Amino acid sequence: MDMNIGVIKGDGIGPEIVDEAMKVLDQVAKVYGHTISYTQLLMGGASIDVAGVPLTEATLAAAKASDAVLMGSIGGDAKTSPWYQLEPSRRPETGLLQLRKGLNLFANLRPAVLYEELKGACPLKEEIADRGFDLMIMRELTGGLYFGKRSTEEIDGVVTAKDELTYNENEIRRIARRGFDIAMKRRKKVTSVDKANVLDSSRLWRKIVE
């Protein structure tokens, strides 16, 4: 199999960990007879330093043309980095949000597994750690607070910040389906987490999921 992987090393420890990940991929490709080519791309602070923006149209187009994207970390120290002197819409993390939206990466999959050898290092109660766990945590990435309208303004002499939380039924339905599809390959159990006793968005979320 021939594959082209877009590589976004990013900022901070990103280049270091991505370099090691590429070594692993190269060995996997060697063992299984694959050929991997890499396209180096800039995003986040690294892109700001070169192009003045956290994500360029060229980088997004190259990511879309890739078979996969390997990414490190984005951003730096908010107290010391000059990137955080910029307007919020031009800071490193906005590049990540734009990439998620551009690639329609709506489902963030985060496996959590407690291996037998690491039970002693687990911060959970002993009776829980002894049973172990194997979870797949899924988070919606392209709707909700991160993509709603936001503002900070002075109202009646008081500085007030607003973040708008919006979900539509299609956004909820597609991530619910992804969750059920993954569950069918595991233990066939799904837990949907919401705040339906307070939030309209959560009430819609629960209705669609059920």
Predicted feature residues:
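Generic N-terminal amphipathic, Lys/Arg-enriched alpha-helix
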Residues: 1-12, 39-41
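Glycine-rich phosphate/diphosphate-binding loop of Rossmann-like nucleotide-binding domains
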Residues: 6-23, 27-29, 157-210
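Short, ordered loop/turn segments at secondary-structure junctions
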Residues: 10-12, 43, 74, 114, ...
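Generic secondary-structure signature for well-ordered alpha-helical cores
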Residues: 26-34, 65-68, 101-108, 114, ...
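N-terminal beta-loop-helix "entrance" segment that forms/cooperates
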Residues: 31-57
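General small-molecule cofactor/ligand-binding pocket signal
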Residues: 37-41, 110, 191
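Short, active-site-adjacent cap segments at secondary-structure transitions
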Residues: 46, 77-78, 198-200
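N-terminal glycine-rich phosphate/adenylate-binding segment common to multiple enzyme folds
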Residues: 49-161
